[in-house]
UniProtKB/Swiss-Prot annotation:
Gene3D superfamilies associated with the record: CRAL-TRIO lipid binding domain, Leucine Aminopeptidase, subunit E, domain 1
PTM annotation (Phosphoserine): residues: S244
PROSITE patterns per record: MACRO
Domain annotation CRAL-TRIO: ranges: 297-445
Family matches, as PANTHER family: GANGLIOSIDE INDUCED DIFFERENTIATION ASSOCIATED PROTEIN 2-RELATED (PTHR11106), GANGLIOSIDE-INDUCED DIFFERENTIATION-ASSOCIATED PROTEIN 2 (PTHR11106:SF72)
Leader peptide range in chain numbering: none
CDD domains named in the record: Macro_GDAP2-like, SEC14
Residues in Macro domain copies: 1-187
Keywords: Phosphoprotein
Chain segments annotated as coiled-coil in the UniProt record: none
Gene behind the chain: GDAP2
Descriptive protein name: Ganglioside-induced differentiation-associated protein 2
Taxonomic source organism: Macaca fascicularis
Length: 461
């Protein structure tokens, strides 16, 4: 019987050393089929592991990552290893740790390790090299995270050990002591190591797959509903769950009938005032989050900024399409940044100038995001938006805009003006009132010739 309680016929202790091992070598030089990269949701995190992988893998890795369109916390995604010794790189995103959300962080970190191993199994990989997924700047306590990492790997190998021959944990000098202390607990090489490790055994060792268990969230379901349970007391004792927790938490309390409320909305029976109040509450939640969130990474893109005023004295806001790497950023954070910047602008009349100039498929905002933005923002955004100047459109963008404004947000249709050249734009907004990205001026000069200080008014605007 080893410290995790696995019967000897289920786990061969003599085989365990080949399953788990730790090393202080660079992860990139690990002789494994795949190595693990810990990153953020846009897969652009700058940490020692990621930077080393990007440097050695070469520029092709960045191109491959753009196709993934990010990675959510707890997920795992696969790319080639390119110039690395490993054939593959498995990318995952560890959770940010806050003590009051400890359970959620534990579950997310478990998912990281579990999904990496599951992906390795599906791709028939014989070995995996793990970095420490819980990066220091995300604040996860090292020892707690190490328990989850080793336990999850151990439980996975108990079930699927025949498919994965070796797992390597590549650790730094700071992490090595913790891993050396806890590795014998989950991968004991002798009975002596087993006994020496017992004091480090945590109270919660998870379920059969290593997943963290929250007792009060366990719900018992009878094997044979409707059938009399003769051994009710015996089974309750064996279950080991305190049923007194059930019903005592917020998620178990009675709430209003949400489906009924939605049905009333669909039937038009909910008053206009109630709908507006509900929408305002939702917008205020987004606004509060926008004011408290760190959005510096989105701001640094310089994709949205205020410039001068148009010929009618209305504020001009500029959106630079080429500066929006849709596949590499968290689009919810982009929405938060839009609200953060625009909330005080939208209290009075304004216009938007969108530069579609030299955008690629990686810069195009999809209709679902635009519809979400339109639905979330306050009514003042729509009421005070007087025009959207769509500069340097393509045929495809014109068709997409027509479909979107016809079938999704018809209220915008009459406000959209396609502007093929800056000559046309200057009939509505003076050149001195707009801060142009240099590439926009260069493109327009190349396509439409240099501009001058006076222009005939365009009938389109």
């Amino acid at each position: 019987m080893d410290p995790l309680g696995a019967p000897s016929q289920f786990v061969d202790v003599d085989a365990l050393p080949s399953w788990g091992d730790s090393c202080r070598d660079e992860l990139n030089s690990s002789d494994t089929t795949a190595i693990v990269n810990t990153s953020n949701e846009s897969l652009t995190d700058k940490n020692p592991v990621s930077e080393s992988i990007f440097m050695l893998a070469g520029p092709d890795l960045k191109e491959d990552l753009q196709k993934l369109k990010g990675c959510r916390t707890g997920e795992a995604k696969l790319t080639k290893g390119f110039n690395l010794a490993a054939r593959f790189i498995i990318h995952t995103v560890g959770p940010k740790y806050k003590s009051r959300y400890r359970t959620a962080a534990e579950s997310s970190l478990y998912s990281c390790y579990r999904n990496v191993l599951q992906l390795a199994k599906e791709q028939s990989m014989s070995s995996v090299g793990f970095c420490v997924i819980n990066s220091a700047k995300r604040g996860y306590p090292l020892e707690d995270a190490t328990h989850i990492a080793l336990r999850t790997v151990r439980r996975f190998l108990e079930i699927h050990g025949e498919t994965i021959e070796k797992v390597v944990f590549a650790v730094s000098d700071l992490e090595e002591a913790t891993y050396q202390k806890l590795l014998p607990l989950y991968f004991p090489r002798s009975l002596k190591e087993e006994n020496r490790s017992l004091p480090y055994l945590p109270a919660d060792i998870g379920n059969a797959e290593g997943e963290p268990v929250v007792p009060e969230r366990q719900i018992r379901i009878s094997e044979k509903p409707g059938a009399p349970e003769d051994n009710q007391e015996e089974e309750d004792e064996g279950l080991g769950v305190d049923l007194s927790f059930i019903g005592s938490h917020a998620f178990a309390r009675m709430e209003g009938d949400i489906d009924k409320q939605r049905k009333l909305i669909l039937q038009g029976q909910l008053s206009e005032a109630a709908l507006q109040k509900q929408h305002q509450r939702n917008y205020n939640r987004w606004l509060c989050q926008a004011r408290s969130e760190d959005l510096s990474d989105i701001a640094s893109l310089k994709a949205l900024y205020q410039t001068g005023v148009d010929n009618c004295g209305r504020t001009v806001m500029v959106v630079v399409g080429r500066n929006i790497p849709v596949t590499l950023i968290d689009m919810d954070k982009a929405l938060l940044y839009f609200i953060h910047v625009m909330d005080h602008i939208a209290v009075k009349e304004y216009v938007l100038v969108y530069f579609h100039t030299l955008t690629s498929e990686y810069n195009h905002l999809d209709s679902d995001f635009l519809k979400k933005l339109y639905d979330v923002v306050d009514v003042k955004y729509k009421r005070n938006l007087k025009a959207v100047y769509f500069v340097h459109p393509t045929f495809r963008s014109k068709v997409s805009t027509w479909f979107f404004t016809t079938f999704s947000v018809s209220g915008l249709k009459d406000k959209i003006h396609h502007v093929d050249s800056l000559h046309q734009l200057f009939s509505a907004i003076s050149p001195e009132q707009i801060d142009f990205p240099p590439f926009v001026l260069e493109y327009d000069a190349r396509e439409n010739g240099p501009y001058y200080t006076s222009y005939p008014p365009s009938p389109d605007l």
